[in-house]
Amino acid sequence: RGCAISMPFKEACIPLVDELDASAQAIHSVNTIVNTNGHLKAYNTDYIAIARLLANYKVSPDLVFALRGSGGMAKAVACALKDAGFTRGYIVAIDEASGKQLAELYGYEWRPDTDGIEADLLINATPIGMAGGNDADKLSYSEQEVDKASVIFDVVALPPVTPLIRYARERGKTVITGSEVFAIQAVEQFVLYTGIRPDDVLFQKAAAWSRL
């Protein structure tokens, strides 16, 4: 019926589909493909999950944020931040072209690194900390940067507790995990695949598991 797309293929898969839903077209990033009689239509349910989590955790849009990454997931995060009312923030990306493009699209500032940035909300939208990767054991932000922040958001879903999340919890920070993103967006994927929306009890069980 379809498939899910994860980092780093959220943009690379776009030429392979027949149609982009409005969400995927606006963000230019895909995480869900639905096959209807051979017609491949792409969607982005990451945005829904990120926006909902920002609201659920009551993350104030007055906070200054740093968003590390400029790929497909970072695009969904940046769009959700803008729609939630965040006006001050930095897109931190090694790739100058994609970093500047994303920052300018939403009215934020691009930086190649975090030097000199003081942010209250730190978001990782890169594979740093992802299981099986070259940077699986690394922090996507320094300990000093985490110490100064109040909210830490890591979109990496595996492992459920990344090095960044582990350190942030040890420091008593508010943390939002990639597992939570995965659980919420997976419900939206399920709806797209089946036309059926799971009841709230089932979702709460899945969300509770994602926070373990």
Predicted segments, located by residue:
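Short helix-loop-beta connector
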Residues: 58-64, 147-148
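Glycine-rich adenosine-cofactor-binding loop
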Residues: 44, 61-82, 86, 93
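NAD(P)-binding Rossmann-fold cofactor-contacting core
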Residues: 84-106
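Rossmann-like adenosine-cofactor binding region
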Residues: 106-175
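Adenosine-phosphate binding glycine-rich loop
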Residues: 155-212
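Conserved S-adenosyl-L-methionine
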Residues: 83-88, 170-174
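Phosphate/diphosphate ligand-binding glycine-rich loop within oxidoreductases
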Residues: 1-57
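Short glycine-rich anion-binding loops that position phosphate/pyrophosphate groups of nucleotides
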Residues: 5-12, 72-73, 127-130, 158
